[in-house]
Structure formats: structure tokens, C-alpha cells
Amino acid sequence: MQNITQSWFVQGMIKATTDAWLKGWDERNGGNLTLRLDDADIAPYHDNFHQQPRYIPLSQPMPLLANTPFIVTGSGKFFRNVQLDPAANLGIVKVDSDGAGYHILWGLTNEAVPTSELPAHFLSHCERIKATNGKDRVIMHCHATNLIALTYVLENDTAVFTRQLWEGSTECLVVFPDGVGILPWMVPGTDEIGQATAQEMQKHSLVLWPFHGVFGSGPTLDETFGLIDTAEKSAQILVKVYSMGGMKQTISREELIALGQRFGVTPLASALAL
């Protein structure tokens, strides 16, 4: 019998959650992570599955995700503990045939359940599947320190925030030319914040929750982690720059245009226009 904890997807989740905790982005039970899988990924590990998988209904049906398996972090679970006990802190779930709920196939032992932000994740997965023709498979939410800090001092506007991050580090425009979506402050763990996040995910691979954290989407765990890491690095630079009295010089609009042309990306027009 193959051990599912040695699979690429469990090992990938262990690395991503451990790295995020070491970055300081996921204190206590902060943050959540979901990865969309294929049946072929989990097929070799059926012998590891629960004999009687628990079924949990979704608060709203998501037919686009019907019959789709995911690996997810658990509600109330600490990222720092995933590496110590993957089966207690992670779970593999599979949405049922009509998208009305899901079965917990593996993990989430001792009656644990998936992250409370699962509605936001699933709704965002739906939008990123449509926006990227199925390419994006990961949704990651974390409490990236400097990005959160900037939501207290910058205007919480997509164009303004995006332009500042682009100017904070040259690679940012290349990594997220589609900019950063921003929500108003909302109560977490609700369908409402999930729907608002998904709406922004139609246009942006990064979405900020002011005074709370960030959502990122990408095709792989590495790409999604790297996306957030890049934005957070720029935010860290900006925090230092602002604390030293602000910018004396920066990357100009013409230089940002040249950067986009060199790397074949189309920058968010509203941010470029500022």
C-alpha cells in the first residue's frame, strides 16, 4: 500500500504551510490553503481513505466543482503543526456529483473539518478556473505582515495599491501585472466575503482583505507562494521607505510600460494611468 503522506500533494502542502509559518504569515491557526487535484492524483491512495467518509453539505451548491477532489487545511489547525501530523491538520475532500457538498476521504482526523474559509476558497476556485481556463489550482490565504500594514496607511484602492507595489520592487509588475484587488473590511468565514473575494478573483490573482490578510491564486503551490512572497517583499520595502520619509525617486510610468513590453505582460491600465 502506498502511503499518501509521501504523495507529491501532501508533501507540497507540508512545505507550503511550513514555509508560510516560518515567514511569520500564519500565526496560531491563521491562514488556509487549498489545492485542486485530479482523480488520477488520488487514485493510487484509495487504501488510505476513510472507510466511511463523512459528508458535509455546502452552504451553496457549486456545480462547477462537481466530482472534484481537493486537499485542504483544517479549521482551527496551526500551520506549524502540519509537518508534525499531516493527517490531523490536512484533509482530502471530494465534491459530490451535483456540487452540493463534499466527502472527507482522508485526514481531518478526530472529527476535524476543513477551514472555515472553504466557501471563499471554493468560490475563488470557480472564478479562477474560468479566468485561467483551468490553469490555476491553488488558493492561499495568509496574514502577510507588511501587506496588512499598508492597508492602514495607503488608500484602499486597487489602482493606488497596485501602483505602489509595482514601484516598490521592479519584479512586481512582471509577477502580477493584473494588479491587486481590494475588498472593504468584512467579517471572515462568511459566504459574503467569499463572494466578494471571488468577484475580485475574476480580474486579479491577488486580493487583499484590509487589516486582515491576502488571498493569492496560481497554477502550483510554488507559484502561488511566490506570488504572495513577491508582493509581501515589495510591501516590506515600502514600509521601510515610508518610515524613512517617503520616496525621493521611483520607477516612472514610462519605465513600467517598458518593463511590461520587455516581459510580454499587459499592466493593469488604471494603475498605470496614475
Curated annotation (Swiss-Prot):
GO annotation, cellular component aspect: cytosol
- What residues make up the catalytic site? 117
Could you state a single Gene Ontology molecular function term? Answer: metal ion binding
State the Gene3D superfamilies in the record: Class II aldolase/adducin N-terminal domain
Location in the cell reads: Cytoplasm
User: Which HAMAP family does the UniProt entry name for this protein?
Assistant: RhaD (MF_00770)
Task: Output this protein's name.
Answer: Rhamnulose-1-phosphate aldolase
Organism per entry: Escherichia coli O1:K1 / APEC
Q: Which gene encodes it?
A: rhaD
